Amino acid sequence: MVVRRRPVQTTKSRLPWHFWVVGPFYVLLYGAGAYDYVMTRGHDPAYFESQGYDDAQIAYFTDYPLVPDVFWTVAVWGALCAAVLLLFRSRWVIPVVLIALIFQVCLDVVTFAFMERWQILGTRLALFDAGVLRLTVGLLFYCRAMSARDALR
């Protein structure tokens, strides 16, 4: 008679409590960014009015060139996908958030250096963009820390 034993699990990868704060926070943050993207790309006049955009700001988004549009699209949807992947504890979250971060940096470089983003949209939105960029860097470091704890599969 052969007795088969189940392997004993010596280490259990428990999730820290902050995982359930950080994950939903980023889903909400990037979900709001996706909503902004859809409303802005759809040229919704009511949305522009609710944001307090003037004619120059509306024209800025209405005549958006292809290259920054690609950067913006990948940055927004990549970041949202990364936040969802984090909640699913997927190991793919790290490359996805890294891609989103790279495209976000490219978008900021192009729009601030060549499209007069600061002058047209103002200080408030420029600081907001910088804050989102910092939060995305934070997400990358957080995901790497969760990977080091074997919290990602």
Q: Where are the regions that the model predicts?
A:
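Topology signature of small-to-medium multi-pass alpha-helical membrane proteins
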Residues: V2-R153
